[in-house]
Amino acid sequence: MHIMEGFLPGIWALVWFVVAIPVISYGALKTARLARNDELNKSHIAVAAAFIFVLSALKIPSVTGSTSHPTGTGIAVVLFGPAVTAFLSAIVLLYQALLLGHGGLTTLGANVVSMGVVGPVAGWVVFRALNPYLDLQKATFAAAVIADWTTYLVTSIQLGVAFPSGPGVAGVVDSIVRFASVFSITQIPIGIVEGALAAGLIGYIAMSRQSIKTRLGVTA
């Protein structure tokens, strides 16, 4: 879903930066506070960031100007919530834009909004809704899958409003549907695989520190 450098019109690039910056700033403050309060949080933050980096770097060419890949945000969402996930995603996306040619600086705001903000919020809502009823791994699986799929829905919206297929709302909606249809071919199975990976990793992390289940409000 990394929209490449220079692909979005300037006005839309600016809009997404304006949306992303406050969330990233709040996430940075929350991440710093968590790291200060608990030494083990530092290692878990590092693991969550590494999971985002590794999975989101596995790109497959997709819609013109974008790619398909896992997002890797599920672990961060479950452990720390959407604000921290937004900050970690922004760091990863900036690094990838500067050093890997993946995404871009002008499109960084748009990429953060889709992968670091809206997708994680959707995943977090799903996790909070399910964790009283499912075990930790199943709730994490669902959260990671929904975060992934929502990310690509948002990217489709970003591309659709920037490049409508025709005049008016109908042209925007048609363009969004077209982008989402192409993404879905690869992203539906990718999201399911990502959910399985996230579930496996969260299970391993929980085994190393049983108190995580209590903090997250799960019993199994």
From Swiss-Prot:
Q: Which Pfam family, an example, fits this chain?
A: CbiM
- What InterPro entries does the database record attribute to this sequence? CbiM, CbiM/NikMN
Kindly state one GO CC term assigned in the UniProt record: ATP-binding cassette (ABC) transporter complex
Q: Gene3D superfamilies from the xrefs?
A: 1.10.1760.20
Going by the entry's taxonomy, the superkingdom of the source organism is recorded as Archaea
Please identify the protein, giving its name as recorded. Putative cobalt transport protein CbiM
Pathway terms, separated by semicolons = Cofactor biosynthesis; adenosylcobalamin biosynthesis
Q: How does it sit in the membrane?
A: Multi-pass membrane protein
